[in-house]
């Protein structure tokens, strides 16, 4: 098949007509039709927040990756734009993989991984991943500039560049895999086109994964955060229950100096579906993160409806007193609110109380008096398969989903915080 932006747009126009909207998100960002995974190129440019994403417009299955594109004035109401990148060049003939976006003067620059095989795709020795550049003056139509970093010798998995400006230089981190050890590699440039290898920023220790995908590196409240998505970490009790994780290392770094870790790897999200998060700065200086709300090899019942996957709501990051990242919905999410009503203070004993009927979307703000409840479990049920509750015996907050007809069953939980209120 010949891939191009015009062919992708024709396919999306046809498929969006037949899309079944029953489960299509009402306020999360999803593709017009087809497949979506990693968020890419989250950036403010010319008064708009631009969100690019990994996209297969020809199918609801993963396939040769394109870059889908949407923009928003408020982070919650999105306007779909034409596909930004298609795998139509020699350097990315098998896919335009994940990357990032930066503003360089009056130009919006996309830096992404060109994915290609030189021979049989079943043989990983034929895999080559290079870093590429595309630029735009209007933020919609992009001119391909070709490869800017070649695959390092002896390496095959080398992807997901994240670029930022620091001082007078551009810096880039790239995820890598060397002898089944995950790495984040560092590069420096004066012009986004000519890059110098600055070495290994961080590398997996035993048990920390064979590949580190989608790295992000930024300053937050005086600390440096290396956020990435490791593959190959084993589950440990309640932790790391998903196939792959997303999380971070905290430490200190200055240009030209090594990254000095201060903490162990910490998962960023303890739910079922959150992967490949990327961050960006708002014009007022807030650090916002958006992730992919699915997981590789998980059932995707929406595929039968002509689409697959969506992105998370924007979350604002901050650093807590215990050196842990805190996430809360960005303040722009409040713009989705409409009618509201209070629920009465309730004390129940082996009872159920219906609070809302026939509600399609809602926001719930809860205050639970955990210190004065003697119930083994108490919480909320949403519809027929979703529960959020406190388990007093385990002293954990639990999210349970049970949709056996779709293969979506299981629980995720976190310890209850100290104190009497939740």
Please report, for each region that a protein language model flagged, where it lies by residue:
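Short edge-strand/loop segments of extracellular domains
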Residues: 136, 234-235, 381-385
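Surface loop/turn signatures of beta-propeller and other carbohydrate-active proteins
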Residues: 2-40, 59-62, 76-103, 139-165, ...
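Active-site-proximal structural scaffolding
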Residues: 35, 62-65, 94, 126, ...
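Beta-rich accessory regions
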Residues: 9-15, 244-422
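Beta-propeller blade signature
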Residues: 66-74, 129-139, 184-192, 241-256, ...
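Extracellular structured ligand-interaction cores
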Residues: 39, 64-67, 96-98, 107, ...
